[in-house]
Amino acid sequence: MSVNDPIGDMLTRIRNACMARHTTVSMPASNMKEAIARILKREGFIRDYAVIDDGKSHKTITITLKYLPDRRPAITGLRRVSKPGLRIYTKRTDIPRVRGGLGLCILSTPKGVLADHEAWRERVGGEVLCYVW
């Protein structure tokens, strides 16, 4: 099956798995998805992720979701911002704050995929991929 928006598909799979209280979610892997998963892990939104290579041409990324002690998901919401039909770019000075700084904005910059505070520190702007809170 062809997916027009792989990042949107990734976010939807994570959102659906959180709502269904699944412990893991798997999807086809790519470098961009791995970079997003790395940021989500570093920021504490997911427990872990692993890229599994089956030896053929297909790689799979498996994300282990994180839940709070009362069984609520650590990820309350995900929103795709820049879409294939409408790309959204921002300057360093205009990087949006998500939920008053409690959320996370993930950007694709010339220095790689970065969280909002990392892009600010690196003094770069870029494409706003998604918001996570």
Swiss-Prot record:
UniProt keyword rRNA-binding, yes or no: yes
Cited InterPro entries: Ribosomal_uS8, Ribosomal_uS8_sf
Gene3D superfamilies membership: 3.30.1370.30, 3.30.1490.10
Subunit structure of this chain's protein: Part of the 30S ribosomal subunit. Contacts proteins S5 and S12.
Single Gene Ontology BP annotation: translation
GO MF assignments: rRNA binding; structural constituent of ribosome
Name of the featured protein: Small ribosomal subunit protein uS8
One Pfam entry name: Ribosomal_S8
SUPFAM superfamilies: Ribosomal protein S8 (SSF56047)
Function (record text): One of the primary rRNA binding proteins, it binds directly to 16S rRNA central domain where it helps coordinate assembly of the platform of the 30S subunit.
Species annotation: Chloroflexus aurantiacus (strain ATCC 29364 / DSM 637 / Y-400-fl)
Domain of life: Bacteria
One GO location term (cellular component): ribonucleoprotein complex
Gene for this chain: rpsH
Family classification: Belongs to the universal ribosomal protein uS8 family.
Keywords for the protein's UniProt record, in alphabetical order: Ribonucleoprotein, Ribosomal protein, RNA-binding, rRNA-binding
